[in-house]
């Protein structure tokens, strides 16, 4: 039982109005659930969708040179630190080299190590897509914001896929 449920449970057990208190307990637990969910790594499908959506939005920004949509999907602290123009300058080499890795949409990411939530509540996701001849490597960090994971850090690079 969570600390919130224990505290609310104590309140309910001492109360003279069990129905009203039960409603309060249900309401508190309903609002606590998203916060609890944000402290866990998403399901395999959810994590794959998060990684692909992040990297494909980043790829679109690089291909088009327009970082506005990518910027809008960042966590607030990241958005405040990096304007769309600064993002474009930061990833200038991707834009200049015309790096396009939209092929990742057809592949499952390989996580190394497994995704985890650190002590600060950040979702850390590192790995690669087994694309050939060039492999896409990523190191992403997300924070909970408005009930969903929002990007706070991104490192992406491409390299030649290892030959068997």
Model-found features: residue ranges?
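A broad structural signal for short, well-ordered beta-strand segments within beta-sheet-rich domains
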Residues: 1, 98-101, 148-151
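N-terminal secretory signal peptides that target proteins for export/translocation
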Residues: 1-18
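Bacterial N-terminal signal peptides
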Residues: 20-32
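Short solvent-exposed beta->alpha transition segments
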Residues: 41-53, 68-122
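Short helix-adjacent coil turns
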Residues: 58, 62-69
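Exposed beta-sheet edge and beta->alpha loop/turn motif
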Residues: 109-164
């Amino acid at each position: 039982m969570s600390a919130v449920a224990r505290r609310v449970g104590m309140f309910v057990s001492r109360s003279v109005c069990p129905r009203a208190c039960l409603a309060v307990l249900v309401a508190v637990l309903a609002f606590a659930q998203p916060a609890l969910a944000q402290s866990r790594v998403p399901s395999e499908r959810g994590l794959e969708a998060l990684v692909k959506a992040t990297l494909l939005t980043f790829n679109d920004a690089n291909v088009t040179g327009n970082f506005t949509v990518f910027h809008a999907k960042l966590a607030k602290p990241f958005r405040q630190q990096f304007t769309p123009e600064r993002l474009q300058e930061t990833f200038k080499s991707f834009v200049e080299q015309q790096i396009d890795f939209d092929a990742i949409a057809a592949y499952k990411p390989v996580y190394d190590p497994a995704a985890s939530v650190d002590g600060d509540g950040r979702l850390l996701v590192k790995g690669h897509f087994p694309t050939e001849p060039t492999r896409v490597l990523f190191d992403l960090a997300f924070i909970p914001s408005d009930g969903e994971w929002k990007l706070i850090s991104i490192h992406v690079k491409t390299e030649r896929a290892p030959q068997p």
